[in-house]
């Protein structure tokens, strides 16, 4: 019932990101955009971009099942009814047999279309307010390097066994880092993140090149001198060492030297230590991209006189600017960006379902319902680096599709980030199952660390026209 309400009140009325302008560059190019049980054709015409309901007006067959190039018309493969690229009716085989059908009345139903920084948006509600009004001042946050000066270098789409909202919530905060991503704690001030909300979007800034404040009182915390990023790692919270024995097998050594073995799902095999961190077991013992197992744990070696954390952070930022200057110097001036813009994780959540990151962290996310199944979703990870030459951008990457049981590391184009997404994927199916099992039928959000999630739900209440005074949103609705 809640999913049906979302389709009626949200997906049928809200501006949503459909594709890239670069993905349909020429007349006749088209992109199929699907959300819930709705399907749209986004088409490049002689006069610009249009979006139509992807359904034949004869007997309902999809006009196109996948993206394509250079179409001269939109012809249904079932009986041959055809429309021009502008949506007007072109042809009906045996037209004499349809005396009630007038071509001028059978144009394809349109959705609103607009663009923003190289992205194409659609809105099924033809009476909706303009996209510019919906996005507000979002463009100001990306003015130093707009997305139309970047290119899509990777695009991975994975089916997840979790509702699209619960999946998205996992990427709205850094609060989960201490438990889910222990390998990030040495370089991420997770609990020191800043959260800001705007009308239809929110932002988080999680500082890098600083340690997590959770490590401040860890007396046993010490970085392994002979450690390896993906093969031998000391857990920063309890000091246990996790070593890769082989694919799927991890040795865990505690502070007293006791050893046990676990598989990469943290299932105990032997030894006196009977519990292990499932996220670190997957990180160390799970599938790993080629060449990553030998990556050492190395700290930057700053020059003399660079001693304090603030000085080291500024030095690392300067190095990143120099690296960027060599690769994107024609497009942006790295000196125009602050240390925070260069180093930190700046991630936005634009209602209802997409998340762009800042210039120097190229990640970009989108979530959609998986058809009409509220217990599953489609989670997409893209990367948008700055184009070295803004006048000669590479073509957008093709989509790699992963099933619910596929490991993220299959997507080698994501590099080490694939390992991080795999850690998140350990939690999410169990979040979905656990929400269904709750007795109290409510969840609790942190006052500050989960600000973005609170903001998301305020927007959901508003769009679904639900008053908190008369309707209870239970975990089943998430």
Regions of interest found by a model, annotated:
Residues 260-294:
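Mixed-charge, Lys/Arg-enriched low-complexity segments
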Residues 240-260:
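A short, structured beta-strand/loop element
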Residues 23-126, 130-141:
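Rieske [2Fe-2S] iron-sulfur-binding domain
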């Amino acid at each position: 019932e809640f999913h049906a309400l979302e389709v009626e009140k949200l997906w049928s009325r809200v501006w949503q990101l459909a594709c890239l302008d670069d993905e349909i560059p020429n007349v006749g190019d088209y992109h199929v955009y699907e959300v819930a049980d709705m399907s749209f054709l986004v088409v490049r015409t002689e006069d610009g971009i249009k979006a139509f309901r992807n359904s034949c007006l004869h007997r309902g067959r999809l006009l196109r099942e996948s993206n394509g190039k250079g179409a001269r018309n939109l012809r249904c493969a079932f009986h041959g009814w055809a429309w021009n690229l502008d949506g007007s009716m072109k042809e009906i085989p045996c037209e004499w047999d349809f005396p009630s059908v007038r071509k001028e009345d059978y144009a394809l139903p349109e959705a609103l279309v607009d663009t923003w920084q190289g992205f194409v948006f659609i809105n099924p509600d033809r009476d909706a307010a303009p996209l510019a009004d919906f996005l507000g001042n979002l463009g100001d946050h990306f003015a130093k390097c707009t997305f139309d000066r970047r290119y899509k270098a990777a695009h991975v789409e994975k089916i997840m066994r979790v509702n699209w909202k619960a999946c998205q919530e996992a990427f709205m905060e850094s609060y989960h880092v201490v438990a889910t991503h222990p390998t990030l704690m040495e370089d991420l001030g997770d609990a020191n993140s800043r959260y800001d909300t705007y009308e239809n979007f929110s932002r988080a800034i999680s500082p890098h090149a600083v340690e997590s404040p959770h490590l401040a009182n860890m007396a046993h915390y010490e970085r392994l001198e002979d450690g390896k990023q993906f093969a031998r790692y000391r857990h920063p919270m309890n000091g246990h060492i996790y070593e890769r024995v082989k694919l799927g097998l991890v040795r865990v050594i505690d502070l007293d030297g006791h050893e046990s073995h676990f598989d990469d799902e943290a299932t105990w095999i032997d030894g006196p230590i009977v519990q292990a961190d499932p996220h670190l077991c997957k990180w160390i013992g799970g599938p790993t991209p080629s060449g990553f197992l030998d990556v050492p744990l190395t700290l930057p070696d700053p020059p003399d006189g660079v001693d304090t954390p603030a000085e080291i952070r500024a030095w690392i930022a300067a190095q990143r600017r120099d690296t960027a200057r060599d690769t994107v110097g024609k497009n942006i001036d790295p000196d125009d960006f602050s240390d925070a813009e260069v180093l930190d994780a700046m991630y936005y959540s634009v209602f209802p379902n997409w998340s762009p990151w800042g210039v120097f962290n190229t990640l970009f996310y989108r979530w959609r319902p998986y058809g009409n199944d509220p217990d599953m979703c489609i989670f997409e990870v893209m990367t948008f680096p700055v184009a070295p030459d803004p006048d000669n951008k590479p073509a957008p990457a093709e989509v790699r599709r992963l099933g619910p049981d596929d490991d993220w590391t299959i997507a080698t184009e994501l590099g080490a980030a694939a390992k991080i997404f795999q850690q998140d994927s350990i939690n999410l199916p169990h979040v979905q199952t656990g929400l269904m099992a709750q007795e109290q039928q409510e969840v609790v959000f942190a006052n500050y660390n989960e600000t973005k999630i609170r903001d998301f739900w305020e927007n959901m209440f508003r769009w679904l026209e639900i008053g908190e005074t008369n309707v209870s949103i239970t975990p089943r609705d998430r």
